[in-house]
């Protein structure tokens, strides 16, 4: 069973992370949560000084409510590591984040949002056709980590667009993002960039990401990530030197803090911002690889993430002592 195998692998990674934190002098505990009620119980049982949570939203038992977990933490005075809830919502909305980048002159592929109601959907499709930016790649607007995309998400004409849109609607519903697909460019390269906020500012750690088994057109799916179908390599020095000022602006405009990871593309001789993961589920293969290329061991980057949150909270007067 693939799902069970993945769950076992993830659990092993979490337990390994806990051992790293113990070795570094923390008193950590691992807790799984499927609802806000689970978090309440865990907080009451352990009374933590700091919380690192990889889940952005959770339901409340008996209520038709989905809570932004970081917003809930703030409402209940829980000290947490990571970006504030407004930034999490912005990062989860690909369209809003791309609009903000455009406002500040950040290069991001031409895109359009396709709403759900039939009359609005047709209007949005017409807008996309008028942009004439084929090929497009379709993505659920509010899902990250490559969820919801596969090779059939790349469309080259109106007929393929409508077919792929109908399929994605059945599976996910909601607003769909269609953006110009850059993978057909001859110089295409995908870059991931991890960020940890240190005592002297943000440390940006880029890596080039590719497929173990190349496809006709480059697209990394959730399955590729889960089945170790990707490989990360250091970014060459010249490309990194050109890339880092662009990445710094992209992260700053997104408003992230403590730690984050961004996805970028190099195509047609330019860097393009694709999306930001405002709440990476640590430990993360790409984050760890990028950190390693920057000279940080697994222990150093994991402890560095906790240190970033601790440092910020102490400066805010939220933590009294080490």
Q: What would you call each of these model-derived segments?
A:
Residues 158-238, 245, 268-272:
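Phosphate-binding site of ATP-dependent enzymes
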Residues 236-322:
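ATP-dependent carboxylate activation and anion-phosphoryl transfer catalytic cores
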Residues 1-14:
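Glycine- and acidic-residue-enriched helix-capping/strand-helix junction motifs
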Residues 11-116:
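Conserved N-proximal alpha/beta basic substrate-recognition cap immediately N-terminal to
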Residues 1, 56-60, 141-143:
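Short glycine-rich anion-binding loops that position phosphate/pyrophosphate groups of nucleotides
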